[in-house]
Every structure is written in C-alpha cells, then in structure tokens.
C-alpha cells in the first residue's frame, strides 16, 4: 500500500496574490517582479488578482507584508527585493531582519509568504539570480506561493 502524500500543485488560479517589493536596487528588483508576474499569469492567475505594493527597501518589506496579511484579502504574499553585501555589517542586519520578519508574518497570520529577496555578495550575483544564469528568483518565489496556496487549501479541506 503506497504512503499517503499531500502536496501542492502550481495550479491555484482563483487566488489573489500580493507582491511586496522593496524599491532599493531597483535595477535588479524589477526583473524579479517581471519574473513573478509572468510565472503567476502563465499558471492561470489573472492580472486582476495580482497587486504590487512597493516598500522603500528590504528592511521595510516585513511590516508591509504584515499589514497586507492583516487585511485578509490575499491568499499569498510574495516578497521581492535585493540586499547586496557591502563593506559594513549593514547587510547582515537588513538580510537577517527581513528574513525573520517575513517568517513571523507567515506564522502569525497563516498566510504563505514566499521569499524572493535576494541576499547576495555582489551585483553580479544579483543579476544572475534575477533572470540570467541562475534563473529568476522572483519566478521561483511565485511558484512557491502557488504551491503553498494549493497545499494549504488541501490541508484545510481535511
């Protein structure tokens, strides 16, 4: 007898999705946004069910995501941004707090928060992860959101 397996799919066209986007490093972030929107639309989500909400930077994304989750209007939140390491400890603070804050929002409100915030050592790595050699992490985050919406709906139906 096979083991029972529950897993999400990339088909959740009825969902509403909020993209919470940090504007800092916009030359990279806009590629993440394009990748996320394209992935959602290719998997059946209407553009009318996608809202882009812009925050100043990655550090502010968790608070905006929290407010979005509180509204209860969206099935998933996709956080997009880019934190590029510099010569000071600033990178660790911003990347760490953004990560912790987004995880907290997801757990507190039971809403999937897909992590598409690049935390990289160089501009070259950011460019690679926003649509060139290493794929588009915005598109990957959107697919994670779709899968989580599908998975949670199955778990809630049980």
Curated annotation (Swiss-Prot):
One Gene Ontology term from the biological process aspect of the record: riboflavin biosynthetic process
This protein's UniProt keywords: Riboflavin biosynthesis, Transferase
Pathway noted in the entry: Cofactor biosynthesis; riboflavin biosynthesis; riboflavin from 2-hydroxy-3-oxobutyl phosphate and 5-amino-6-(D-ribitylamino)uracil: step 1/2
Quaternary state and interactors: Forms an icosahedral capsid composed of 60 subunits, arranged as a dodecamer of pentamers.
GO cellular component, one term: riboflavin synthase complex
EC number(s) stated in the UniProt entry for this protein: 2.5.1.78
Family from the record: Belongs to the DMRL synthase family.
Protein name in the entry: 6,7-dimethyl-8-ribityllumazine synthase
Catalysed conversion reaction: (2S)-2-hydroxy-3-oxobutyl phosphate + 5-amino-6-(D-ribitylamino)uracil = 6,7-dimethyl-8-(1-D-ribityl)lumazine + phosphate + 2 H2O + H(+)
Binding site residues for 5-amino-6-(D-ribitylamino)uracil: 24, 58-60, 82-84, 115
